[in-house]
């Protein structure tokens, strides 16, 4: 199996785990109040959707043989776009949807923690 295929499978698993965390957190917060659940889901999607866009961007550029030094610039551009998209989604959730801050920020942090810890668990072959 090629390295790119392995990294694609790991990325898909990571995105799936993040989506499951968003859904689970939204369901748990909706037990208190349905709007808390919506707020939690919007906080999780503020991390999940930019990650999906970044993965699509990375997969699209993975097929090409880039020029020397271009990989770093492409990665930096994609990461900057991801952070900017996350900030825009958080502002929309707080300003437009009037989301409750606590479930939004808790789910946001949860998905970020999953983003950091899940690759170590996924790659652990035991």
Swiss-Prot record:
The chain crosses the membrane at residues 15-35, 38-58, 71-94, 101-117. Residues 36-37, 95-100 are periplasmic. Its main location: membrane. Residues 2-14, 59-70, 118-126 are cytoplasmic. This is ATP synthase protein I. It is a multi-pass membrane protein. Keywords: Cell inner membrane, Cell membrane, CF(0), Hydrogen ion transport, Ion transport, Membrane, Transmembrane, Transmembrane helix, Transport. One of its GO terms (biological process) is proton transmembrane transport. One of its GO terms (cellular component) is plasma membrane. It is found in: Cell inner membrane. InterPro entries: ATP_synth_I. Belongs to the bacterial AtpI family. A possible function for this protein is to guide the assembly of the membrane sector of the ATPase enzyme complex. Signal peptide: none annotated. The keyword Cell membrane applies. The keyword Transport applies.
């Amino acid at each position: 199996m090629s390295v790119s295929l392995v990294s694609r499978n790991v990325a898909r698993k990571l995105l799936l785990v993040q989506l499951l965390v968003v859904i689970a957190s939204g369901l748990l917060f909706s037990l208190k109040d349905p709007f808390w659940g919506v707020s939690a889901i919007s906080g999780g999607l503020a991390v999940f959707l930019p990650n999906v866009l970044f993965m699509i961007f990375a997969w699209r550029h993975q097929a090409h043989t880039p020029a020397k030094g271009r990989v770093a610039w492409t990665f930096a551009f994609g990461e900057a776009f991801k952070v900017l998209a996350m900030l825009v989604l958080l502002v929309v959730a707080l300003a437009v949807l009037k989301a409750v801050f606590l479930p939004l920020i808790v789910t946001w942090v949860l998905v970020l923690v999953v983003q950091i810890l899940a690759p170590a668990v996924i790659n652990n072959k035991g």
